[in-house]
Amino acid sequence: MSVIKMADLDLNGKRVLIREDLNVPVKAGKVTSDARIRAALPTIKLALEKGAKVMVMSHLGRPTEGEYDEEFSLAPVVNYLNDALEQTVRLEKDYLNGVELADNEVVVFENVRFNKGEKNNDEALSKQLAALCDVYVMDAFGTAHRAQASTHGVGLFADVACAGPLLSAELEALGKALDNPARPLVAIVGGSKVSTKLTVLDSLSKIVDQLVTGGGIANTFIAAAGYPVGKSLYEADLMDEANRLCAAAVANNGEIPVPTDVVVGNEFSDSAVATLKDVSEVTSDDMIFDIGPDTANKLAKIIANAGTVVWNGPVGVFEFDQFGNGTRAIAQAIANSNAFSIAGGGDTLAAIDKYGISDKISYISTGGGAFLEFLEGKKLPAVEMLESRAK
């Protein structure tokens, strides 16, 4: 994919508007998880090093559009940036009609969702944003799947529209994993429902060598294979779909392995007793909360032999330690593998943190919905816009 890259541009003295994803959790005016800000820092620093006048914009939370609401202010993010950049960073509330900027100054625009027309990609708002800058930088992979004024419209009207280093790295890593992967390509897709990830499963079943399912998704495949699932979360109306996906995988010389042993409990709680069972021995009162050690070992061997691993979602209720062994085993197998590995999605990142393997994953994606849509084979609107502006 051909886009202009910020790293290749002369930004000296230029007004540079960077769209980052600084949508971080805030409690009592303090940022409680800074991962997204840390991921954005190298881009902001690079723009400063290149002599730019830097403007940064982002959304935070879901305020009522067009209304200022202090609860969703980017003020805590600006306080964080003051320390991280070791310089004064200004929060600008009224910026649509122009902003005065000194060389090497950093200004953060207040929450873009306070602007009427942000979500529906309003043309007038997009043109106002574009008029503020010489160069627009889209660096927020996490919102690249949304065509909004700050992620898409502005780029259509700015003099120059380019991809920031973070977005460029995401696209390169995903391209490496999906467009021309080292084989075997193994995808691990967890989560509670087949319905929410059906298009992902459908798309991946056509290109992967092994598609591993986990969580509630796996329960639907277990039921479709004719095994009892008791009171487990599963989707009876999608069992035919599960069988179709299995057949599609086999037709493409791939496989969707069904667990042979599972760990069950009789209630969803951190005090539930974990019992290991053969997949054929699940009773009517059981709930499947994890894969068993035999299944985990088989999957670990598949991962050990992989050339590329794509991981989206845990394989069990890993928040409760007694149901976390399957996800831990998968995480360890990926960490020990020589494969190129890419992981994304909130629960996946929480598992990576819990088992301390972040430095062993080749690339950790900052995007949730955008990561999934890329896996589905969809074109991301922001990326399409950047490609069109590079022509």
From Swiss-Prot:
GO terms for biological process: gluconeogenesis; glycolytic process. It holds the Pfam family PGK. ATP binds at K197, E319, G345, G346, D347, T348. Its EC number is 2.7.2.3. PROSITE patterns: PGLYCERATE_KINASE. GO terms for cellular component: cytosol. Pathway: Carbohydrate degradation; glycolysis; pyruvate from D-glyceraldehyde 3-phosphate: step 2/5. Its main location: cytoplasm. The keyword Magnesium does not apply. Belongs to the phosphoglycerate kinase family. This is Phosphoglycerate kinase. It comes from Pseudoalteromonas translucida (strain TAC 125). The gene is pgk.
